[in-house]
Amino acid sequence: MSKTHLTEQKFSDFALHPKVVEALEKKGFHNCTPIQALALPLTLAGRDVAGQAQTGTGKTMAFLTSTFHCLLSHPAIADRKVNQPRALIMAPTRELAVQIHADAEPLAEATGLKLGLAYGGDGYDKQLKVLESGVDILIGTTGRLIDYAKQNHINLGAIQVVVLDEADRMYDLGFIKDIRWLFRRMPPANQRLNMLFSATLSYRVRELAFEQMNNAEYIEVEPEQKTGHRIKEELFYPSNEEKMRLLQTLIEEEWPDRAIIFANTKHRCEEIWGHLAADGHRVGLLTGDVAQKKRLRILDEFTRGDLDILVATDVAARGLHIPAVTHVFNYDLPDDCEDYVHRIGRTGRAGASGHSISLACEEYALNLPAIETYIGHSIPVSKYNPDALMTDLPKPLRLTRPRTGNGPRRTGAPRNRRRSG
C-alpha cells in the first residue's frame, strides 16, 4: 500500500448516503485514508469490521461515516421507544468520547440524526436531559452507560450499530466486564453492524471480536511498521541527576511549536510541570486527578495553541485528536511497549512529520529492549555534552493538587544550547 496519507479512493466513489457525502465534503474530506478505503466497502455491505491502524489515520471518521450511513439507509424498528438509541459508540476515556462527539456533530447537523454523550465525572443531569429527549447515536464511556442503563434511562434493545474504539485500552483499564454487560443487552450480533477499531489488535481483542461480532473481517494498515515512518525517533541516556536539565535543554534547543511530555506517574508529571512553568513555558498538566472540566479546558487550550507544552500521564496517550503536535518527549520510557507506540503516535499525524525524543534513565532503561523488540527496530541514540546542559534555572513551582498552571507566555528566542556529536 502507498505510504501517502490519502488514497486515490474518494468518498463519493462509494454508495454512501448523499447527506453523508455532502457533510464530508463540506468539512473538506474528499479522499479516503487507507483504513477508510479498506473499511467502507465492508461496512456498506453490512459486514462487521475489526480494524487496526496507526493513530491519526482516520479510524474515527471510518466508523462515524459507516454509522451514519447505516442509520440513514435502514429504518429504526417500528416500536422503538424514546429511550432507545439506534447506535452505541463506546470509548475508554471521557476525553476520547468528547472528541468523537465533536467529530460527529457536522454529520449530525447535515443528516438530522441526534447525538447523545455519556461520560462520568460530571454533567450527569445535563447528559440525562439530552437522553430523555431521545437520541439516535449515543457516545460514551462504559461506567456512565451502565449507570443510565440500570436506571432505565437508556435501553439497548433497538441498537442497529455498535462501535468499540480503542479496544485494547478497554482491556488495559479493566473495562472488559462492563463491555460484555452492555453487549448482553443489545440485539444479537447478526442483527446489528459491529465495528471495532484500535491501534493494536492483540489476541485478547481478537477473542472479544469473535465473541461479540458476526464473523468480523480483520483489516490492517501498515502492520509491519508499528511506529509511523514520518516520526523521527531519538534516544538519550541521561543520568538521573542530569535528566531534568537535559529535558529543559532539549526543549530550548528544539523550541517545539506544540509538544507533549509523557511521564509514568502523576508525581513525576507534577515535577516536570513545576520546572517548566517556573522557566516561563506555557505548560499544562494532564493527569487522572485533574477535574473533568479542567481536563477538557486544558486540552482545548493546547489544541488552540494557548499552551505550547502538555505534560501528561498515559491518560492522554490514546485516541485524542490533537492536531499539529510537533514533538513528543518520553521523559520516562513506558513500562508497556504498546504505550510507546501510542505516545509517539501523537506526532507525525495526518501526513505531517514529527519528532519523538526518549530519555532512557537509570530507572527505566530496562524497558528499552522490550520496546525495541516490539517496534522491530533500534531507536537511534544521540549523545549530549553534560557541560552544555542548562544550569541557570529557577526554582521549580510546587502545587498541592494538579492544576493547569499556565506559565507566562514564552518571549524572545530560545537559548542557544547545542548537543555534542
Curated annotation (Swiss-Prot):
Example of a GO cellular component annotation carried by this entry: cytosol
Binding-site residues, ATP: 53-60
Residue intervals of the Helicase ATP-binding domain: 40-219
Keyword Cell membrane: no
Claim: Ligase is one of the keywords in the record: no
GO biological process: RNA catabolic process
Annotated region (Disordered), positions in chain: 392-421
Catalytic activity line of the entry: ATP + H2O = ADP + phosphate + H(+)
Motif (Q motif): 9-37
Subcellular location: Cytoplasm
Residue ranges with Low complexity bias: 402-414
EC number(s) from the headed UniProt entry: 3.6.4.13
EC top class, as a word: hydrolase
SMART domains cross-referenced by the UniProt entry: DEXDc, HELICc
Subunit structure, as described in the record: Component of the RNA degradosome, which is a multiprotein complex involved in RNA processing and mRNA degradation.
NCBIfam families assigned to the protein according to its UniProt record, in alphabetical order: PRK04837.1
Annotated protein name in UniProt: ATP-dependent RNA helicase RhlB
Gene this protein is translated from: rhlB
